[in-house]
């Protein structure tokens, strides 16, 4: 599997993926720091909540759509799928490598954005943001990303990059309303795109040490973790089984 991941990394050389992963967090967090350093009245909690609401509900769904879609689009451009068929390359490992590489790319992008935000605010504005707390929230949001990454990979293989990006935009709209407002209090568990923003808020709640509040939402926290793992496993298994038995479709026109 390591060799498959190394190949995936080499394929992204001089591609859009590396620009997305390494440049977008610099731009987004840089803009956030540029705005926040002049707002002395904003609390650390507001910074935390605002950043992860925007990042997890907006950036992640669209980013997942672009990353998974573009990875498959590049394979179509290079005719790699026909090479896989003719050379007998392990399809299961190939599919899993795409999934793992997508997760790693999203994780690097998220952690980089958080580190830039925290360092920028701590150096330029003396906010004393807890980097450990923000990194923990990033990890939780990435766990919440697993199901939608598995879903988008299936969409990308079957329908192409355009459909994956379109689904990401729809996911962003749904996550914004369902994941960040009271509208989705009773239906968020049916919307995987809301999981990242819900998961990212857990570390702050845990740090509050409010036993009464924690007791009220402990079941939701457990459900979030359970759904993230189970749904990602289900969609990943479905994707692997489908890809292992399918005829490759040409999506170069998408």
List each language-model region with its residue ranges:
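Aromatic- and glycine-rich beta-strand/loop motifs that create alpha-glucan
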Residues: 1-25, 248-253
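Terminal transmembrane helical anchor/hairpin motif
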Residues: 41, 46, 171-250
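Residue-level recognition of membrane-helix boundary sites in multi-pass small-molecule transporters
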Residues: 16, 20, 93, 98, ...
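Transmembrane alpha-helical segments in integral membrane proteins
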Residues: 66-71, 76, 153-156, 161, ...
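Secretory targeting signals
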Residues: 24, 28-63, 68, 97-161, ...
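Helix-loop-helix units of permease transmembrane domains in multi-pass membrane transporters
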Residues: 70-104
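Pore- or pathway-lining transmembrane helices of multi-pass membrane proteins that form conduits
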Residues: 20-25, 161-180
């Amino acid at each position: 599997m390591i060799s498959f991941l190394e190949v995936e990394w080499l394929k992204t050389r001089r591609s859009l993926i590396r620009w997305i992963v390494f440049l977008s967090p610099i731009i987004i967090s840089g803009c956030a720091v540029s705005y926040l350093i002049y707002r002395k009245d904003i609390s650390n909690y507001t910074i935390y909540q605002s950043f992860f609401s925007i990042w997890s509900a907006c950036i992640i769904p669209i980013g997942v759509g672009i990353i998974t879609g573009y990875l498959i689009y590049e394979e179509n451009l290079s005719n790699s799928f026909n090479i896989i068929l003719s050379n007998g390359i392990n399809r299961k490992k190939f599919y899993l490598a795409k999934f793992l590489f997508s997760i790693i790319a999203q994780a690097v992008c998220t952690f980089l954005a958080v580190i830039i935000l925290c360092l920028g605010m701590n150096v330029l504005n003396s906010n004393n943001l807890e980097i450990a707390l923000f990194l923990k929230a990033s990890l939780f949001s990435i766990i919440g990303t697993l199901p939608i990454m598995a879903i988008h990979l299936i969409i990308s293989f079957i329908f192409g990059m355009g459909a994956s990006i379109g689904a990401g935009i729809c996911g962003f709209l749904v996550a914004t309303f369902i994941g960040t407002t009271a509208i989705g209090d009773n239906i968020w568990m049916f919307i995987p795109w809301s999981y990242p923003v819900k998961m990212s808020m857990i570390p702050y709640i845990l740090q509050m040490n409010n036993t009464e509040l924690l007791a009220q939402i402990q079941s939701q926290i457990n459900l979030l973790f359970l759904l993230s793992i189970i749904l990602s496993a289900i969609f990943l298994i479905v994707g692997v089984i489908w890809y292992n038995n399918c005829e490759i479709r040409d999506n170069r026109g998408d």
